[in-house]
Regions:
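Outer-membrane beta-barrel porins/channels
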Residues: 19-26, 33-331
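Transmembrane beta-strand segments of Gram-negative outer membrane beta-barrel proteins
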Residues: 1-14
């Protein structure tokens, strides 16, 4: 009637930035290793009602440009979001269940720049609410379908200070507003036989309303939100159960680029079309406990930065990899 799950995750990769003006020093690989952790608890209230709570890292990105031509504008940046998610699920009948959660989100943003040949670090944090609704349908004995809606999450960060860029010195606010867009996800699982299952999902994200990281110098907004568009997600996977103790998974996913043009992306948000390839395994240690591991590789579309013009350049063939381990215990 009770279950606890704990997990550890790590993300790394290569995001290489090369300036168009080769007379200037390029940042090179700006990616930093990002560790993460998660914990979940669920409890059966009665035959139809379940309650749970989760604490997990929603997303994170650490970039380190080092000592480069634009280090007076940005040298290092870290963005982290953690979520506390209490939830309820209710079984309406043998074919239909509903679920909902109210998420308390904590966001942290830091920015380090070169000021008078010294690292000047500023940071800010914010709290935001978001919500999730879900519907699970048992279509047949072998087929299940679900739909999930996640609301938009708005973070607002404000960091004030002085920045000295190539064409002059300014007293300016450096600001960033990060919004995680609302999304809808459809999913389907079909058990072919006791050993094989196939699954897939299709999703949409409202990135056209997303606030891209903004750097404002005087009255000039260097990163323009109008460059963004909605995105689509698709994934397919297979699960194989060779024995009652083992579950083996493999899958591939695609996410379309949020940018209208890959030749005009934000300096601090290099992304594009993404292909992810993953595999994992779960082992039932005892009737009450299991352990799982997973690894995945993400290939990202190349992109080009137009503004600020002095630091125009390219992110060529970026990639990320992810690894995770989790343990669950029922009691």
């Amino acid at each position: 009637d009770h279950m606890v799950t704990g997990g550890l995750q790590v993300m790394d990769g290569s995001i290489d930035n090369q300036l168009d003006n080769h007379a200037h020093q390029s940042p090179g690989d700006v990616m930093k290793t990002i560790p993460n952790a998660s914990a979940f608890y669920s409890q059966k209230i009665n035959d139809d009602l379940y309650a749970g709570i989760g604490l997990y890292g929603n997303y994170g990105l650490g970039i380190d440009y080092g000592s480069w031509a634009g280090d007076r504008l940005i040298k290092k940046s870290t963005l982290v979001a953690m979520t506390l998610s209490p939830s309820l699920a209710y079984k309406l009948n043998d074919h239909l269940s509903i679920g909902a959660s109210a998420n308390v989100n904590y966001g942290y943003f830091s920015l380090t720049r070169n000021v008078n040949d010294n690292d000047y670090r500023q940071h800010d944090e914010d709290w935001a609410m978001s919500y999730r609704l879900g519907l699970l349908m048992q279509l047949t004995d072998q087929t299940r379908a679900g739909i999930t809606w996640n609301s938009e999450t708005n973070y607002r960060y404000s960091v004030n200070g002085k920045a000295r860029v190539q064409n002059g010195a300014y007293d300016l606010p450096v600001s960033a507003q990060i919004s995680a867009p609302q999304q809808i996800m459809l999913s389907l699982v079909h058990d072919i036989n006791p050993r094989w299952s196939v699954m897939g999902d299709l999703g949409w994200q409202d990135w056209s309303q997303f606030g891209a990281p903004q750097i404002v110098v005087g009255d000039r907004q260097l990163n323009n939100v109008s460059r963004l568009k909605d995105t689509w997600h698709g994934a397919v996977g297979v699960q194989y159960r060779p024995t009652p103790q083992w579950r083996l998974n493999i899958g591939v996913a695609f996410d379309s680029s949020p940018y209208e043009s890959q030749s005009d992306v934000a300096l601090t948000l290099p992304t594009g079309d993404e292909w992810r390839f993953g595999t994992g395994a779960q082992y039932q240690i005892t009737p009450a406990s299991n352990i799982g591991i997973a690894v995945s590789y993400l290939h990202m579309q190349s992109s080009h930065v137009k503004s600020p013009t002095a630091f125009a350049g390219s992110y060529d063939h970026p990639y990320l990899w992810f690894a995770s381990v989790n343990y669950s215990y029922q009691f």
